[in-house]
Swiss-Prot record:
This is 2,3-dihydroxyphenylpropionate/2,3-dihydroxicinnamic acid 1,2-dioxygenase. Pathway: Aromatic compound metabolism; 3-phenylpropanoate degradation. GO terms for molecular function: 3-carboxyethylcatechol 2,3-dioxygenase activity; ferrous iron binding. Pfam families: LigB. It is an enzyme of class 1 (oxidoreductase). It comes from Azotobacter vinelandii (strain DJ / ATCC BAA-1303).
Length: 312
């Protein structure tokens, strides 16, 4: 039994609003190394903690976290279409284990997932189906949010389960770091926007293209005086990475949602996926971790980081 972890940022603007060629080459190189490590590990199972961006989950029923026994990519921002290769019975066993651990996780037998889940699978495996994968989607953009201590406990429950399998398991967390793309809030939203946030599934191609164009436009001015969005916060990002690398996970229980939103951006809460992933790894004991990469990239509206870890 071997368990390894990779946490990395994702960005729908990759290839659509790129920084300089030298930065793109840096990211390409670190992703190539990460892919090679995944290839060498050859996981028998991947568990991916990921966010959603109002593509599969909406306010008509917004769970704090949900596990899927079947999932299909919405193929936004040019990501791969098609189903994920989910081992249904194993996903159900994991669901029962999480519920028995005192955590009320939601269950979906037909979930739509977006780039927040699929981009990382594509970058690290080249496919949505190469390895068996169980996706766990954590609400990271639609307040109110579950407290961070619940996310840590979710990760711990998942970690206890995967440790019992006797398999090579890769745990992925994807999102963040400091991050504020133009995601609307329900509070105070105009009627049309509110309706989308409540029940906006399966938009027309024209509506999806318009939404993506707004994100690209935001990326072109992000980090300048023209942008109304919270700027990237390198100090916050690096402090968070240090906390994870050093194994200080108990401190996460004291994270305050409003403070993070103000300091690092409203979508920084995608770090919940990193919290769950590291808590899952730590459930089996001490780990060793390393920071593979970090750079604030305004064009991608992301403090872009990559971190790897494994059990000692």
């Amino acid at each position: 039994m071997t368990i390894k972890l990779k946490c990395l940022s994702h960005t729908p603007l990759r290839g659509l609003n790129d920084p300089g060629a030298d930065v793109v080459a840096e990211v390409d190189a670190v992703l190539a190394r990460s892919r090679a490590e995944v290839e060498a590990f050859d996981p028998e199972l991947i568990v991916i903690f990921a966010p959603d961006h109002y593509n599969g989950l909406f306010y008509d029923l917004m769970p704090p976290f949900v596990i899927a026994t079947a999932a299909e990519s919405v193929a936004d921002y040019g990501t791969l279409p098609g189903p994920l290769s989910i081992p249904r019975d194993l996903a159900l066993d994991l669901t029962r284990h999480i519920l028995d651990s005192g955590l009320d996780i939601a269950l979906s037998h037909r979930l739509q997932v977006d780039h927040g889940c699929t981009q990382t699978l594509e970058e690290l495996t080249g496919s949505l189906t190469r390895y068996p994968v169980i996706p766990i989607i954590i609400n990271s953009v639609a307040p109110p949010f579950a407290p961070y201590r619940r996310i840590r406990k979710l990760g711990e429950a998942v970690g206890r389960f995967v440790a019992s399998l006797g398999k090579r398991v890769l745990i992925l967390g994807t999102g963040g770091l400091s991050h504020e793309p133009p995601v609307p809030l329900l509070s105070g939203a105009a009627e049309e926007i509110a309706e989308f946030l409540i029940a906006g599934r399966n938009p027309t191609p024209e509506a999806r293209a318009a939404r993506q164009a707004r994100t690209i436009a935001a990326g072109k001015i992000y980090g300048t005086a023209e942008s109304p969005l919270t700027p990237l916060n390198t100090d916050w990002d690096l402090a968070f990475i240090d906390l994870l690398v050093q194994g200080r996970l108990a401190e996460i229980d004291d994270f305050v949602v409003e403070e993070i939103s103000t300091t690092a951006g409203r979508s920084t809460h995608e770090i919940r996926t990193w919290v769950a992933a590291f808590a899952a790894l730590a459930a089996g004991g001490a780990y060793r971790a390393r920071q593979d990469y970090y750079r604030p990239i305004n064009e991608w509206i992301a403090g872009y980081g990559v971190v790897s870890a494994e059990r000692r």
